[in-house]
Amino acid sequence: TGKLLFPKEAVLDWINKDSIITGKGQLTITGSHDPLLEAVLRQTSIDIATMWNGSSAGLERVASGKASAAVIHIFCPAFRSWNIEPVKTTCADKDVVLLHWAKRSRGLVMKPFVALHVSSLSAIRPYRLSQRQKGAGAQILFEHLLDEASIRTEQLELTATCHTELESVLALLEGKADIAFGLEHYATKYN
């Protein structure tokens, strides 16, 4: 599930003053690529910069003061929960607010001929698989699911390393991969 991470002071200022978040320099949203947020931002007249660099990198940028907000969806296997523990750890001394933004529907996105042969995660081994960059929420979750299925990444043919949800699915259309761990939104859009 995706979350947006904002500095608490900025949220309270926005609520109390009925204004947009302001601060030093450019308002920047970083972290996980979120197609819904991207569409919403395109419809606004607010000057907001985006940097889709993955959940973990986005969280680090907020913690270091280099970003105004981060879109994150980081599964924490030890707690079987999303986002809270990584935020507590990374932003322990920061004044931040964690807001629920949206739920993501994700799974294996496959070329049609592959879908005929893959009915479980264990059946992906012979196929080329696009992957997300280290620290991306999707990659963290996928590696957890592989671990639960007793599959090591060394057993897979990993091809393209993709930096956005869209890139991950486009790798299939471009012939770089047969399977991606991606969003239902893009699977439906590019089917």
Indicate where each model-derived feature is located.
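Short, intrinsically disordered, charge-balanced linker/junction segments flanking boundaries
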Residues: 1, 123, 187-191
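Ligand-binding cleft/hinge of the Venus flytrap
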Residues: 39-45, 121, 132, 138-160
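Short helices/loops that flank or line small-molecule/ion binding pockets
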Residues: 56-68, 74-75, 161-176
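Short Pro/Gly-enriched coil loops immediately N-terminal to beta-strands
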Residues: 90-109, 124-125
